[in-house]
Design a protein with these regions (language model features):
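Active-site region of glycoside hydrolase catalytic domains
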Residues: 1-261
């Protein structure tokens, strides 16, 4: 992934020139709880990508905590220079936070099975406090603020964009007496209000947040859950493909209109 990013950035700049605006989007984690566990996961889930892309090197600690499953001998001469291409903006996907703690399991040997956090077999994921979205993810607007501030503190040279943020709800389609259709989703509106406020606090504290994309415009196919989870601010009747704007759509429209100028 890191090499592909470097090759893509080189190719775009070679083809488009100075007009090119290059970026990368990462699913960054923000964890709460035990400091050692949070640091371990930050190395594996965040800095394994951010450091080579933005600093031109992998963290030394990353090598030590993954030595039981990987010797990193695949890194070839010139790879880091290729990965470390200048970008104009860093995209961040954010939905929720995790609560973690170090376990009493030994770090090594570690399983070589597929994992979202290789090198963290001695970290426990703990239950999070509610409320939760329909995905089971906790709602933590402060986590967005804290993540934006931390990324800016560590990598101050790059502008930031929130490329995904939103929630899945158990949306119900209502057919009104006059035949019109509506979807009332007050929880989603509250979610967006609170996350927008958290992002605004980060901006006020100096974070160069230049964009924000709500996930998502339409209900869509989720990789793991298919059509069972609805993130859109527009309801999709999958049988007819009809699109019905939800209450959150109207709220978001009015919010954007109020911000013009």
């Amino acid at each position: 992934l890191n090499l592909a990013h470097g090759l893509m950035t080189q190719a775009v700049r070679a083809d488009v020139g100075d007009k090119a605006k290059c970026s990368v989007t990462l699913n960054l984690q923000f964890n709460r709880g035990d400091a050692d566990a949070c640091h371990r996961l930050d190395l594996i889930s965040n800095r394994a990508f951010l450091d080579p892309m933005l600093r031109g090197r992998y963290p030394d600690e990353l090598f030590s905590i993954t030595k039981g499953i990987c010797d990193w001998d695949f890194i070839q001469s010139g790879d880091l220079e290729l990965i470390h291409q200048p970008i104009d903006v860093l995209g961040i996907n954010y939905y929720s936070t995790n609560r973690v703690a170090m376990s009493d399991r030994p770090q090594f040997p570690q399983s070589t099975e597929a994992s979202t956090a290789p090198g963290a077999s001695d970290v426990d994921w703990l239950p999070t406090e509610g409320p939760h979205t329909d995905m089971g993810w906790n709602i933590d607007p402060d986590g967005l603020h804290d993540l934006l501030v931390r990324v800016h503190d560590n990598y101050p040279e790059v502008d930031l964009v929130v490329t995904e943020n939103g929630m899945a709800c158990k949306d119900q389609l209502t057919v009104n007496e006059d035949g019109t259709k509506s979807v009332h989703d007050p929880d989603r509106i509250d979610y967006l209000k609170r996350h927008f406020a958290a992002a605004k606090r980060a901006i006020d504290e100096g974070v160069p947040l230049t964009g924000y994309f709500v996930w998502s415009l339409l209900d869509n196919f989720e990789w793991y859950f298919g059509y069972a989870k609805r993130f859109g601010i527009t309801y999709v009747d999958y049988a007819t493909q009809e699109r019905i704007p939800k209450d959150s759509f109207m709220w978001y429209r009015d919010f954007l209109a109020s911000r013009k100028g």
